[in-house]
């Protein structure tokens, strides 16, 4: 009995036979032959490269290759075992119809020794090694392979070596065009076609094209909302089996992929790979439109939709459209009121898993992402990224209408409504309308007088958490917002914005009634009330109304008699901070208001105004 060579496993075609094959069949033939040769080379059987392989690698027509032109390979495989892992050859048989024989277990007495083997056991060792070559041929019956605690049944390909490689997590085959790597050479070959293959599979629904028919099939499910893969545990359904497999890990809680840098563990190796980029700062996914780079291909896909304005997922309830199907799913919960994510600690429920994750940190108090510039810590890396822009002054989000730039995309979205004038959220109590639902929620607290945010230092309460945060800086003296022009620091970003206009002199908000211009849009809104006579802030004690909430707050002190602003020099107290500031001048002797006519100085601006009448 002879030994198996590459000649024995190669399939040949005449010119007539080759011309009967279509492009897909020719490509399949080429892939099978190259894969067979690589398997022999891997075991050290194929030493020199046959002419057929050279021809196929150069993508030339192999029909004119004759069997005697193929270089005979050194002996390597025992034909007894080869019958079980390689198909019978013959030009008359189509390579597509070749079926791998079922492997029959045989006892020691039935084993034929490989030429050169000294014992049955040695021959058996060779046999075990060749089981890994069973690839690229369809089998008539699946075989099972136990790996750790997993039992996998292979119906399409019998390849134990491939299975083992997946579990060692080694990815030796790297793509030259990008940073992606693969555990199998065939996977790399398939991936490379992204760069070379024409996207011939087109979606009739939206016109999107794909490299693979299978990808098109998966994509079509986004339009039909078909989700055939259902979780038995919670009933959640998925449109792809891979997403279903990923979801199942959430029930087991297993996270075998650990980051060596920070110790964080993940359920998927791909998630670990993406996570590592936080430490390395690597952003391999670049937008060809604007040059912006991302650490994840999914983030790049989302970003690209900003350029084309694509929003394929539409809500049937209200007509609102979204970039992602997952965003649509979350949005639908606003209409249904569904809150599937429940906190085990306090039983609070949420409509989004991300909100539950954020909420959980309230119980742990963990803030792992720290700013190197000022030491401030954050729950999320994205929040840290946004915070850093305060220090760098970066404003990547620009309004196409007026050119104004912003630190955050959400701020740009808010700003755009200024141009449209749309205010869809209306207060049922007073009729006031707002751009955002959050602003309406905050406004309603004026009517209910609810102030849930209390200062631990002085017990003062606020209706907004942001107002409490700003207030706390009075006690700490923190002023994180610094002017690059003059170095002056402020406790609020809005105050810094207003201050910067002193240097530029810009007053972009103009009153259409009288032409007066203002630095801030909020100041313009307050000014307009002079013309309209609107006074929305009413004192419950005496019924007096005011056009500004600050004036109402000052007025209320008349009824309470409270004087919170005390002079450290003489102990005199005042109901306004401005009155205290004016009073302090008595102790310092400062007279900042000077007459240009005679040089006389005054403590008060009103006194200077009266004095000027002497000259006129």
Curated annotation (Swiss-Prot):
The keyword Transmembrane does not apply. Signal peptide: none annotated. The keyword Cell inner membrane does not apply. A zinc finger (C2H2-type) spans 173-195, 201-223, 229-251, 257-279, 285-307, 313-335, 341-363, 369-391, 397-419, 425-447, 453-475, 481-503, 509-531, 537-559, 565-587, 593-615. Gene3D superfamilies: 6.10.140.140, Classic Zinc Finger. GO terms for cellular component: nucleus. InterPro entries: KRAB (IPR001909), KRAB_dom_sf (IPR036051), Krueppel_C2H2_ZnFinger (IPR050826), Znf_C2H2_sf (IPR036236), Znf_C2H2_type (IPR013087). SUPFAM superfamilies: beta-beta-alpha zinc fingers (SSF57667), KRAB domain (Kruppel-associated box) (SSF109640). One of its GO terms (biological process) is regulation of DNA-templated transcription. Residues 4-75 form the KRAB domain. GO terms for molecular function: DNA binding; zinc ion binding. Keywords: DNA-binding, Metal-binding, Nucleus, Repeat, Transcription, Transcription regulation, Zinc, Zinc-finger. PROSITE patterns: KRAB (PS50805), ZINC_FINGER_C2H2_1 (PS00028), ZINC_FINGER_C2H2_2 (PS50157). Pfam families: KRAB, zf-C2H2. It is found in: Nucleus. May be involved in transcriptional regulation. Belongs to the krueppel C2H2-type zinc-finger protein family. This is Zinc finger protein 726. It comes from Homo sapiens.
